Design a protein with these regions (language model features):
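Conserved C-terminal alpha-helix-loop-beta "cap" of PLP-dependent enzymes
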Residues: 298-452, 457-463
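Short active-site oxyanion
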Residues: 68-70, 97-101, 442-443
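Structural signal for conserved beta-strand scaffold positions within catalytic alpha/beta enzyme cores
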Residues: 72, 124-126, 220, 345, ...
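N-terminal "arm"/small-domain region of PLP-dependent enzymes with the aminotransferase-like
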Residues: 1-52
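Conserved PLP-enzyme active-site core in the AAT-like
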Residues: 2-10, 76-306, 322
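Flexible, glycine-rich loop/tail regions that form catalytic "lids" or insertion modules at the edges
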Residues: 428, 467-470
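Conserved N-terminal alpha-helix of the aminotransferase class I/II PLP-enzyme fold
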Residues: 34-79
């Protein structure tokens, strides 16, 4: 597959043209990549008005992912999330009342800032009480979604879309096919934050990408699981989305810099050639190595590794339940760090390890050696550790559902605010989302009144300060 952006920039660098244009480094500098860092010079195209090499590269990505249309972002899935919500708002019927989105509660804070910028409300889908033991996960069954939509309809409210995160930070995958069928039966678009799942289209057994499963709008963080520089992402449109080219590019431009990174654009462009060539085989090898390691861990400490297989699990994320080692997630992460392995995420319960198709045999061997050593040295699984308490999330959900909303998300985010100790926040209006990052998933959402039920979760996830609206 051709790489028009990469080819153009390399030719330009080789020509040794005198650069009387931005950037100021003029192709020289300490990093070594400066000669490939350009701006929108003649022939380089423009990301938000693409007609040349960028449009050609995006057409290649569209073909690879099998979408109706795929667009590039150099500012991560956060930009794509805001853009696809803007598009969904534009598609809603005129004079439909104040806009409301139905969304699973484990959403990234980018959704909340989109709600503040675009001024819509969010009706939350909470996990069932027996499935609510972790901040990152919010399983939604089709029946529960259908019931929630019926309840909103009975109140005279029709959401402009349904929003899900799949896969989530712990590797849980929603039933996108079943949930999209419910959405479409109600005449609603399904929007999916697939930031962690760009690779799902390239599985040997067939695509598990949300667009192929019925999602209408979807974002992928290419940089999370593909060989792409940080910030590279995709906005995908499904076949049912009736939005013209200009509307989509305008939506992205609304939330993006007018100076998109050409290093990231080249990275996205180069990835197309990799995805079209050897990526599936390399991905399969990575999955095989990860499966072998998972089976070894099951033999050493049953219950340590969450399954890699099954309809609701993604196959490229190793999530470890640290309680099987008598440790907290943070303790297990530190033990790995001391042995030369850095994990993606750790909380009181779990750690998340994210290999990719680019992970080498030597890197897997290093991880294997480290985990074997920790398993040999760790205490028994019955040592007291901070465990997940589904009741804590259920209690928070009940408290928040029962309270009246005094501020919209937009009003709370833009209001004068102050930082106070989290333990003193009860009864105050949350201004900025109360999150730890990663995973950037809020315990409290802007505009909500902090109930006592939030305090145990603040403590569990290390949130010591809360931004509240000034009184």
């Amino acid at each position: 597959m051709n790489t028009p952006v990469v080819d153009f920039v390399r030719r330009y660098a080789q020509q040794r043209t005198t650069r009387m244009h931005m950037p100021g480094h003029k192709g020289r500098g300490p990093l070594g990549c400066e000669e490939l860092d350009i701006t929108e010079i003649a022939g380089a195209d423009e990301l938000y008005e693409a007609e040349g090499i960028i449009a050609q590269s995006e057409a290649n990505a569209t073909q690879l992912f099998g979408t109706a249309r795929t667009y590039y972002s150099t500012e991560g899935s956060s930009q794509c999330i805001r853009a696809m919500l803007h598009l969904a708002l534009q598609m809603r019927p005129a004079k439909a009342g104040r806009p409301v989105l139905l969304a699973a509660r484990n959403a990234h804070k980018a959704l909340l800032y989109a709600a503040a910028l675009l001024d819509f409300d969010i009706q939350w889908l909470w996990p069932a009480p027996d499935a609510a033991g972790a901040l990152c996960t919010c399983p939604v069954e089709p029946e529960a979604l259908s019931s929630a939509l019926d309840e909103l309809s009975a109140e005279g409210r029709t959401p402009f879309g349904v929003y899900l995160t799949s896969p989530d930070y712990l590797g849980f995958v929603q039933d996108v096919a079943g949930l999209s069928a419910v959405c479409h039966a109600h005449g609603l678009p399904l929007l999916v934050d697939n930031a962690h799942g760009a690779y799902l289209h390239f599985l040997k057994e067939g695509s598990r990408h949300p667009i192929q499963l019925g999602a209408d709008l979807c974002c992928d963080s290419a940089h999370k699981t593909l060989p792409v520089l940080t910030g590279g992402a995709y906005l995908h449109l499904g076949p049912s989305v009736q939005a013209d080219e200009a509307a989509v590019r305008n939506a992205l431009a609304l939330f993006g810099s007018t100076s998109p990174s050409y290093l990231i654009l080249q990275s996205l462009d180069a990835a197309n050639a990799v995805l079209a060539d050897s990526f599936r085989e390399k991905l399969d090898i990575c999955r095989w190595r990860l499966g072998m390691l998972c089976r070894e861990l099951d033999a050493l400490r049953p219950g340590l590794a969450l399954p890699l297989t099954g309809a609701h699990r993604e196959p490229l994320k190793l999530t470890l339940d640290a309680a099987a080692l008598g440790l907290s997630g943070q303790q297990l992460a530190q033990a790995l760090r001391e042995r030369g392995v850095e994990c993606e995420y750790a909380d009181p319960l779990y750690i998340v390890l994210m290999p990719s198709a680019e992970s080498s045999a030597a890197e897997f061997a290093c991880l294997q050696t480290a985990l074997h050593a920790i398993c040999d040295e760790a205490p028994a699984a019955d040592v007291s550790v901070t465990a997940g308490d589904p009741a804590a999330f259920a209690a928070l959900a009940g408290a928040l559902e029962a309270q009246p909303r005094r501020f919209t998300i937009r009003e709370a985010v833009l209001a004068p605010q102050e930082m106070i100790p989290a333990a003193e926040a009860v009864g105050r209006i949350c201004a900025a989302p109360a999150v730890s990052c990663p995973p950037a998933i809020p315990i409290m959402v802007s505009g909500e009144t902090v109930p006592p039920e939030a305090l145990p979760l603040f403590a569990r996830y290390g949130i010591e300060k809360a931004a509240v609206v000034k009184e």
